[in-house]
Amino acid sequence: MKKEIIIVTISLGNDGAERILTELARQWVHDGHHITVIQTSPNRYGNEYALEEGIEQIQIHTTSSNKVIRFIQEIKELIKILKTRPNATCLSFLSASSFILAISSWFVKNRIVFSERNNPRKVPIGWHQQALRNFAFRFADALVFQTEDARSYFPESVQKRGVIIPNPINGKLPPPIEGEREKTIVTACRLHPQKNLPMMINAFSML
């Protein structure tokens, strides 16, 4: 059955959540679903990830230099778009876009799904950002977590609407090499404590 799915994001900048949403959008459009990606601030963090052909793209461009007014403009434009697609399921992978979508959900009939991509105890940084994230989660019809530990951080009212779905893997990865090969391990990521590279190094040292 063909479904209409709308992914709301700040931009398609070079980050993990954006990579995951582009992977999922690619697979879903291949499965025959109608996929739309809405960027609320397309120029803020760049557009590092390209979307598959067949995925509809909508960019919301605001005109004010005032941050609060820009925020209101983004919500108004998003509501206007969603009202034309009441049967679409709306997804968000970032706390900032989840908050915008949560406010918009008061005025539309769409099913809302939020995905927690990080350790909720540490990300987003700052109590006020975490408060906005927790506020947004109250308005989700369903929530996606990567681990049971992440889901257990939230109150029961959130946990009972949550499901555990691990990260997807790119289907275009090359097949593993058979036979003898060098014992060399390569990783590519930001040098940031969140990536916990020491744990990875220690884990591979045990092999």
Give, region by region, the residue ranges found by the protein language model.
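Carbohydrate-associated surface elements
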Residues: D149, P168
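A conserved mid-protein helix/loop that constitutes part of the nucleotide-sugar donor-binding site
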Residues: D15-E23, K183, H192-M206
